[in-house]
Amino acid sequence: MSNLSPDFVLPENFCANPQEAWTIPAHFYTDQNAFEHEKENVFAKSWICVAHSSELANANDYVTREIIGESIVLVRGRDKVLRAFYNVCPHRGHQLLSGEGKAKNVITCPYHAWAFKLDGNLAHARNCENVANFDSDKAQLVPVRLEEYAGFVFINMDPNATSVEDQLPGLGAKVLEACPEVHDLKLAARFTTRTPANWKNIVDNYLECYHCGPAHPGFSDSVQVDRYWHTMHGNWTLQYGFAKPSEQSFKFEEGTDAAFHGFWLWPCTMLNVTPIKGMMTVIYEFPVDSETTLQNYDIYFTNEELTDEQKSLIEWYRDVFRPEDLRLVESVQKGLKSRGYRGQGRIMADSSGSGISEHGIAHFHNLLAQVFKD
């Protein structure tokens, strides 16, 4: 904590009692010093969910992801092993790949044409045979920890990190219970936004349904708020609620035991199992700075050829539901800097943990306090 002023120190028991809790102070959402601390103490040390395994199912498939200024490339080798590396050439630092797609059997740097095998080993460096003491072992790509877990791909920049299951104990089994088809999902749509909001602001918004009625009329028409619960499980939480058919959003057969499952994963991923069988949505957050977050909002179905009903649902997410949340977090980010905001807001957590209770935010802010404690 020596690099932070006392303004950024939180007591270890901050928000420990949700019914008496207030949010973290506003400057934690706006000050770059807080974000720099989070970069090293949250994002460089945590397992971050970055993709569904189906996006990297075949040999030579690759994707790139950027988080806290680091570009990471994930690639499936010809040996079918999925690996992650820092997306940087060890020669002079040029990035190797961009976007996603099919890699060739060697990755060639665009700058000086150094070539690397898909396992990260150097294949060839031009003129290296004429360079004294050239050591190919020191010219390999630098690996990033990677695990496939519950149908998804996670990375961790800490080489000494324990497993995803250690960070999120019990999550995998619960996701599989909520969506038995999770391993069969395929990406159907992606909405990418560079959102002018702090990553914690976006998580706060996700961790409560207090705003659902006023801000999400279509979604609220399908969720039964009186049969909606939010349970805490350490580094992940589960929002669970029974669903009802709605002409505004989710259409399914009346009388089925349909439900919503919303999983938040520390620090910044949200997995959503919808009432529609064989469907999930995922919000991947990739923080850029204290007031900017790159978000991928991905929609998955088990079938590749989409039905008209599925296409309509994608359009509803794109044109209605997603913009509703974006407007909320963008407005909050502006308001947090207002002279009229008192610096902290009362967390509306009720004693019953009802469907509109904000106790999930208190839980999240207590986890943040462990990062900012003295």
Model regions and ranges:
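Non-catalytic accessory segments flanking enzyme active sites
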Residues: 24-67
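C-terminal catalytic domain of Rieske-type non-heme iron oxygenases
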Residues: 3, 76, 87, 147, ...
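Short, contiguous pre-domain boundary segments
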Residues: 6, 10-26
